[in-house]
């Protein structure tokens, strides 16, 4: 493996080398140290594979994965890679099956990922076949540990990663339970191609500072302003975070107008304001909660729009974002209608999220030739802890704290 040339400067996580988004050797190391290392990768929703034989194909970083429920009702996950010549075992995005068979040479696997059959293993009419010493039990795709929390299915290649509850920590667990406290149903999906390194999008998710500055819809229609009540929670590892706020019409002030900030534009009006008319369903009054789990999971509640996002690296300068929109299984018809309408707030062409799909590409293009220079991430100081305000980059610094630990790039004492 080629050596990375990433150079970190300073004694804090307030300076991030632009080369971290463009160095291919570093990206190769991410696959081994992060995605196949001591992390829990989000794989799918438990409700997406409800019955025995139901499966989905997905990825842990670049590694293709099969997630399947067996007759014992347990969920199993293994590499989507035939032990013979490396072809994909399952080609469909989802389905139901009693077993899996590779199309290339018809090697077969059960729903726990065990190799159960080799075509013509004994040869034909006494000729050919596998040697007598060949043992199917010693061959097969790598298997992942599986953990389920609040209906979210996670997988890990590591035997050393702590339990999912310990990995998340109590505050993040509580905030996931707040949203996923009862059964959910999938009500929509999008897959979005992003023209940037995966870390630029995950920084964006954790960046409470940008939300009301980049997104005109947020600010103009008062869904999210830094003057509103809210805060940021960062777990001890730094890798997981929650940003939350509450709509407060009385919190509107002239601070955006005084600074001539583009995102506050009173000239814009909605022809159909019913988009913003929802219903109260959370007793704490929080109208926006964005939660992330390292290395690539997001759970959102924006008004009544609930969704999970899965971020996957695809190359040094591109990534994939899978959106899964959710409703509760006991939603009324009117509640489901509201969720579907408010789904237009986010996604590839969402009134809010459209800009997030573009701005990472602006950075990726802007840092060309600047690998030895640094991004400045100093809003709110140099710490990586929780904050009572959202005019801060503390959770972005937290991401880099966790990233550097997994990558063996910690600050030297």
UniProtKB/Swiss-Prot annotation:
It catalyses: terephthalate + NADH + O2 + H(+) = (3S,4R)-3,4-dihydroxycyclohexa-1,5-diene-1,4-dicarboxylate + NAD(+). One of its GO terms (molecular function) is 2 iron, 2 sulfur cluster binding. Residues 41-144 form the Rieske domain. Disruption phenotype: Not affected by disruption of tphA2II, however the tphA2I/tphA2II double mutant no longer grows on TPA. It holds the Pfam family Rieske. [2Fe-2S] cluster binds at residues 82, 84, 102, 105. Inhibited by EDTA. One of its GO terms (biological process) is phthalate metabolic process. Its EC number is 1.14.12.15. Optimum pH is 7. About 20% of maximum TPADO activity is observed at pH 9, whereas no activity is observed at pH 5. Its cofactor is Fe cation; [2Fe-2S] cluster. Optimum temperature is 30 degrees Celsius. Approximately 60% of maximum TPADO activity is observed at 15 degrees Celsius, and activity is completely lost at 50 degrees Celsius. It is an enzyme of class 1 (oxidoreductase). PANTHER family: CHOLINE MONOOXYGENASE, CHLOROPLASTIC. Component of the terephthalate 1,2-dioxygenase multicomponent enzyme system which catalyzes the dioxygenation of terephthalate (TER/TPA) to 1,2-dihydroxy-3,5-cyclohexadiene-1,4-dicarboxylic acid (DCD). It can also use 2,5-dicarboxypyridine (PDC) and 1,4-napthalenedicarboxylic acid (NDC) as substrates, and preferentially uses NADPH which is the physiological electron donor. Heterotetramer composed of 2 alpha (TphA2I and TphA2II) and 2 beta (TphA3I and TphA3II) subunits. Part of a multicomponent enzyme system composed of a reductase (TphA1I or TphA1II) and a two-subunit oxygenase component (TphA2I or TphA2II and TphA3I or TphA3II). This is Terephthalate 1,2-dioxygenase, terminal oxygenase component subunit alpha 2. It comes from Comamonas sp. The gene is tphA2II.
């Amino acid at each position: 493996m080629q050596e990375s040339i990433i150079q970190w400067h300073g004694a804090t996580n307030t300076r991030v080398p632009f080369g971290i988004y463009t160095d291919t050797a570093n990206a190769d190391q991410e696959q081994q140290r992060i995605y196949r290392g001591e992390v829990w990768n989000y794989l799918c929703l438990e409700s997406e594979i409800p019955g025995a034989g139901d499966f989905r194909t997905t990825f842990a970083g670049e590694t293709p994965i099969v997630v399947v429920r067996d007759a014992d009702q347990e969920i199993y996950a293994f590499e989507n890679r035939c032990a013979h010549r490396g072809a994909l075992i399952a080609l469909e995005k989802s389905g139901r099956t009693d077993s899996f068979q590779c199309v290339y040479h018809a090697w077969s696997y059960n729903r726990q990922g065990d190799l159960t059959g080799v075509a013509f293993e004994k040869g034909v009419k006494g000729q050919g076949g596998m040697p007598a010493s060949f043992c199917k039990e010693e061959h097969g795709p790598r298997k992942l540990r599986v953990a389920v929390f609040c209906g979210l299915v996670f997988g890990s290649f590591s035997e050393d990663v702590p339990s999912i509850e310990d990995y998340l920590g109590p505050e993040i667990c509580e905030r996931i339970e707040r949203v996923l406290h009862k059964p959910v149903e999938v009500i929509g999906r999008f897959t979005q191609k992003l023209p940037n390194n995966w870390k630029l999008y995950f920084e964006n998710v954790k960046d409470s500072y940008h939300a009301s500055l980049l997104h005109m819809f947020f600010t103009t229609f008062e869904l999210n302003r830094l003057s509103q009540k809210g805060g940021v929670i960062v777990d001890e590892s730094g890798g997981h975070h929650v940003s939350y706020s509450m709509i407060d019409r009385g919190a509107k002030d002239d601070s955006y107008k005084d600074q001539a900030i583009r995102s506050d534009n009173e000239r814009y009006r909605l022809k159909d304001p019913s988009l913003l008319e929802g219903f109260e369903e959370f007793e704490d009054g929080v109208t926006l909660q964005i939660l992330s789990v390292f290395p690539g999971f997001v759970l959102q509640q924006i008004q009544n729009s609930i969704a999970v996002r899965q971020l996957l690296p695809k190359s040094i300068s591109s990534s994939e974002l899978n959106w899964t929109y959710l409703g509760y299984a006991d939603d009324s018809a009117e509640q489901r209608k509201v969720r579907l309408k408010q789904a237009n707030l986010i996604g590839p062409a969402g009134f809010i999220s459209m800009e997030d799909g573009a701005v990472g590409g602006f950075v990726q293009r802007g840092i060309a030739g600047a690998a030895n220079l640094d991004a400045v991430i100093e809003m709110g100081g140099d710490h990586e802890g929780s904050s009572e305000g959202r005019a801060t980059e503390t959770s972005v610094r937290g991401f880099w704290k966790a990233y550097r630990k997994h990558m063996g790039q910690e600050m030297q004492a």
